């Protein structure tokens, strides 16, 4: 069986116009996959050079396959049908290492056709490293590497206004474009680079903030033999992902035509502010996950898929989304409902086994950031506590007992919460404190909740009622009235 390469698998080769910092699975099944579609269906005509930003030989360089690899996109489509689509990606030309090919890295800036820079260097990637110097070959941090590359371009083209770049980071931090721009400007200042360079950075370059959304499951280790037999070739860089994807870019409207998004309907939005889209994702996708986990797990289920195939648990989650979360969000209702419908479809994806316990990690912080804002907004708007979001808090407190049907399970959170819950549940078990006192002890931790939740009208009472119902009747019976 042949390994993928351009000699044995000839096809389109595109001129290099895109630099991509990051060789990982996510960008390959998200950015490079979209570029490949645009190359095929429009005149975008843009090849990608991947820059490996870290000092590592693993995984091997994509150049061993001449940049070729296969994506397998699978999940439920818009009609709710299970689909699996294999695509040979030709958008990547080569991969270089910034550590072993530094001159080659700088040379990328000399190409007059280079226009876009994408990146995913992990959440920690857009950060400041005080020791980074201009002459380092290379600097440690991604922003410092980018500053050096931008200065190379500025110098090579004598500050030409039409040689700036559109920089589109995909790291999972708020306003990632603004954060990256600030660090590039900081390095320019600390390295005492000319004022003209700073002017050119500001005037000729666009730093766009983004929201990215797709579950990328990566190399399908357990299925690789069957998949390669089906494909008819060996591919050491197979990359699997869910059917759903969303790319929101906060940038100039002209970006739509420059990326040829006006010629192919992709799920990419060019917007003035990503904030409402971020809030939508956190509230609906992440919020539904966080409400679902303690309820479904204590109802005897182990994966998100099992939970969505359980009529009662599914009804609980869908009612939480449509009746309690969507009404308090600030985007058009039809947009929110369409997104919510996609979310529940993603939860049902038969190709992804999403363990509830793995999503349960740091549940206390997740509840505060993902659900509490909607609970408080709902109470403010209607004068009543949203029943399911409140019940989810009681279920979360019950989850921290760490025991289901007499068997213990691992609970992962900050140590102070683990210690606090261990003590509270032991005291409750020994009848030293009542359920109401336990609830008050959790809701009054202002340094966590950023307020004293015992002051929220009716919250202690309702969480206590819900928690007592869970403890006395079991999760199935307790949640039934809300399904």
UniProtKB/Swiss-Prot annotation:
Binding annotation for NAD(+): 18-29
Presence of the UniProt keyword Signal in the record: no
Top-tier EC class: oxidoreductase
Keywords: NAD, Oxidoreductase
GO MF annotation terms: mannitol-1-phosphate 5-dehydrogenase activity; tagaturonate reductase activity
Pathway the protein acts in: Carbohydrate metabolism; pentose and glucuronate interconversion
Catalytic activity: D-altronate + NAD(+) = keto-D-tagaturonate + NADH + H(+)
Gene3D superfamilies for this protein: N-(1-d-carboxylethyl)-l-norvaline Dehydrogenase, domain 2, NAD(P)-binding Rossmann-like Domain
Alphabetical list of InterPro entries matching this protein: 6-PGluconate_DH-like_C_sf (IPR008927), 6PGD_dom2 (IPR013328), Altronate_OxRdtase (IPR023668), Mannitol_DH_C (IPR013118), Mannitol_DH_N (IPR013131), NAD(P)-bd_dom_sf (IPR036291)
Documented EC number(s): 1.1.1.58
GO biological process: D-galacturonate catabolic process; mannitol catabolic process
Pfam families assigned: Mannitol_dh (PF01232), Mannitol_dh_C (PF08125)
HAMAP family: Altron_oxidoreduct
Family (UniProt): Belongs to the mannitol dehydrogenase family. UxaB subfamily.
Name this protein carries in UniProt: Altronate oxidoreductase
């Amino acid at each position: 069986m042949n390994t993928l390469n351009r000699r044995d698998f000839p096809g389109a080769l595109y001129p290099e116009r895109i630099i991509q910092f990051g060789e990982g699975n996510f960008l390959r099944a998200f950015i490079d996959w979209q570029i490949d579609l645009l190359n095929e269906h429009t005149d975008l005509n843009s090849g990608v050079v991947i820059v490996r930003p870290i000092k590592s030989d693993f995984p091997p360089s994509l150049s061993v396959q001449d940049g070729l690899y296969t994506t397998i996109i699978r999940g439920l489509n818009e009609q709710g049908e299970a689909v699996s689509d294999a695509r040979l990606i030709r958008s990547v030309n080569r991969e270089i290492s910034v550590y072993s090919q530094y001159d080659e890295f700088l040379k990328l800036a000399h190409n007059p056709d280079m226009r876009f820079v994408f990146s995913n260097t992990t959440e920690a990637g857009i950060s400041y490293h005080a020791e980074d110097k201009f002459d380092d070959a290379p600097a440690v941090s991604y922003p410092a590497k980018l500053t050096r590359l931008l200065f190379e371009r500025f110098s090579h083209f004598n500050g030409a206004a039409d040689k700036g770049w559109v920089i589109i980071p995909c790291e999972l931090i708020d306003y990632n474009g603004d954060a990256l721009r600030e660090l590039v400007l900081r390095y320019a200042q600390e390295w005492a680079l000319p004022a003209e360079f700073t002017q050119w950075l500001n005037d000729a370059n666009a730093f766009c903030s983004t929201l990215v959304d797709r579950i990328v499951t990566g190399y399908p280790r357990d299925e690789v033999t069957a998949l390669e037999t089906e494909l008819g070739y060996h591919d050491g860089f197979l990359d699997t992902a869910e059917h759903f994807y969303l790319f929101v870019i906060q940038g100039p409207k002209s970006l739509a035509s420059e990326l040829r998004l006006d010629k192919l309907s992709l799920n990419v939005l060019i917007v003035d502010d990503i904030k409402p889209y971020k809030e939508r994702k956190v509230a609906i996708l992440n919020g539904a996950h966080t409400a679902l986990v303690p309820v479904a797990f204590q109802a005897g289920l182990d994966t998100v898929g099992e939970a969505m195939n359980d009529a009662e648990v599914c009804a609980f989650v869908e009612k939480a989304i449509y009746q309690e979360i969507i009404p308090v969000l600030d985007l058009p209702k039809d947009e929110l409902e369409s997104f919510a419908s996609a979310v529940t479809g993603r939860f049902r994806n038969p190709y992804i086994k999403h363990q509830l316990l793995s999503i349960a990690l740091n549940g206390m912080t997740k509840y505060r950031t993902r659900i509490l804002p909607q609970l408080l907004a709902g109470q403010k708007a209607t004068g009543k506590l949203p029943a399911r979001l409140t019940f989810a808090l009681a279920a979360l407190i019950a989850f921290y007992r760490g025991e289901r049907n007499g068997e213990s399970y691992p609970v992962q959170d900050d140590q102070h919460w683990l210690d606090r819950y261990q003590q509270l549940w032991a005291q409750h078990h020994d009848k030293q404190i009542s359920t109401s006192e336990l609830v008050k002890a959790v809701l009054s931790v202002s340094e966590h909740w950023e307020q004293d939740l015992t002051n929220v009208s009716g919250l202690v009472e309702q969480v206590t009622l819900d928690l007592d119902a869970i403890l006395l009747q079991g999760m199935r019976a307790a949640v039934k009235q809300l399904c």
